[in-house]
């Protein structure tokens, strides 16, 4: 096992992961931001170097003091050979299987290995799979071969124009974390709110302020750079607000040069239609999250 710390090695890793897009997307996006200053202070592990097979991005051990906090105890994994990475992922130096944790990857093929390791460590594993999309501007720059017409999601639905007398673009404040948490599908608890607070504090966030001067629609970035946690207050839905705030987010992050990608639940047809309005690329791989709980 090797822990990559030098800027040179991490840049080599980023360049290598780029060649394996889109399957490496979740890890690539994380390494990109590690190379931009590592704002979440993440740790990069590889099984060997420089000819690595498997990469794991995780928090530092000193930042994983709460055994029950799977929002913080998150591992991002990419492997060139998903069926033969069990020994590396099974190492206690790589993944602490005694904690409540989650593993995220753009490779569903990792499932059998993760489920096997969960069973070996007397734990329960729950898998969530979603559609994975890449913003067109990112695909053009990083993986132009994905710009095939059959991958481009386009919606012909008409948009409701933004009433700029009532609504104003703004950024979220950490004090808005409770509001975001209340509508986040994966949240709704104290630990998720703490995670959201850190995301708002660390990365650019975007919202639309309503007539009351409070956020009515918003979207954030998580610790991997993924566009996440979008939401709209129920009374303001069906006004295309989430489209307008997501469009603002994409325009701003494009200027910063950030890779942009997001997942959508397979049953969330409303957000899928919005993705169509934004003209994003549906990737051939999927967004995967395995929640592991020791019994």
From Swiss-Prot:
Identify one Pfam family in the record.
Gly_acyl_tr_N
Compartments, record wording: Cytoplasm, Cytoskeleton, Microtubule organizing center, Centrosome
Task: Spell out which residues are annotated as carrying N6-succinyllysine.
Answer: 41, 48, 124, 128, 140, 255
Q: Name the enzyme group at the top EC level.
A: transferase
Q: Which InterPro entries match?
A: Acyl_CoA_acyltransferase, Glycine_N-acyltransferase, Glycine_N-acyltransferase_C, Glycine_N-acyltransferase_N
Which reaction(s) does its UniProt entry say it catalyses? Answer: an acyl-CoA + glycine = an N-acylglycine + CoA + H(+)
Select a single GO molecular function from the record's annotations and give it.
glycine N-acyltransferase activity
Grouped into one coarse class, the protein's main location is cytoplasm
Superkingdom? Eukaryota
Reply yes or no: does the keyword Cell cycle apply: no
Gene Ontology cellular-component annotations: centrosome; microtubule; mitochondrion
Q: Does the keyword Acetylation apply?
A: yes
Which residues span the membrane?
Answer: none
| UniProt-listed Enzyme Commission number(s) | 2.3.1.13
Q: Which residues carry this modification: N6-acetyllysine?
A: 41, 43, 48, 80, 83, 124, 128, 140, 150, 255
Q: What are the entry keywords?
A: Acetylation, Acyltransferase, Cytoplasm, Cytoskeleton, Microtubule, Transferase
Subunit structure of this chain's protein: Binds to microtubules.
Q: Name the protein family.
A: Belongs to the glycine N-acyltransferase family.
Role according to the record: Acyltransferase which transfers the acyl group to the N-terminus of glycine. Can conjugate a multitude of substrates to form a variety of N-acylglycines.
This one is known as Glycine N-acyltransferase-like protein Keg1
């Amino acid at each position: 096992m090797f822990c990559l710390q030098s800027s040179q090695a991490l840049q080599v890793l980023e360049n290598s992961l780029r060649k394996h897009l889109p399957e490496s997307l979740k890890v690539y996006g994380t390494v990109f931001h590690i190379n931009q200053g590592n704002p979440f202070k993440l740790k990069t592990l590889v099984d060997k170097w420089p000819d690595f097979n498997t990469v794991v991005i995780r928090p530092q051990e000193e930042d994983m003091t709460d055994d029950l906090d799977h929002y913080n105890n998150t591992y991002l994994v990419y492997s060139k050979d998903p069926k033969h990475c069990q020994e590396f992922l099974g190492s206690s130096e790589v993944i602490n299987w005694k904690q409540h944790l989650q593993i995220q990857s753009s490779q569903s093929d990792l499932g059998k290995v993760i489920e096997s390791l969960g069973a070996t460590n007397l734990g329960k594993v729950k898998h969530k799979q979603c559609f994975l999309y890449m913003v067109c501007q990112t695909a053009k720059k990083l993986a132009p071969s994905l710009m095939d017409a059959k991958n481009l999601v386009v919606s012909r639905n008409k948009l409701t124009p933004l009433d700029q007398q009532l609504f104003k673009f703004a950024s979220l404040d950490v004090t808005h974390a409770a509001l975001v948490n209340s509508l986040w599908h994966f949240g709704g608890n104290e630990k998720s709110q703490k995670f959201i607070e850190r995301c708002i504090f660390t990365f650019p966030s975007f919202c639309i302020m309503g007539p009351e001067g409070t956020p009515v629609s918003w979207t954030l970035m998580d610790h991997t750079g993924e566009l996440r946690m979008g939401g709209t207050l129920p009374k303001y839905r069906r006004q295309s607000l989430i489209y307008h705030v997501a469009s603002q987010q994409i325009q701003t992050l494009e200027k910063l040069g950030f890779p942009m990608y997001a997942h959508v639940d397979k049953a969330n047809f409303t957000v899928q239609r919005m993705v169509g309005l934004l003209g994003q690329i549906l990737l051939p791989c999927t967004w995967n999250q395995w929640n592991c709980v020791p019994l």
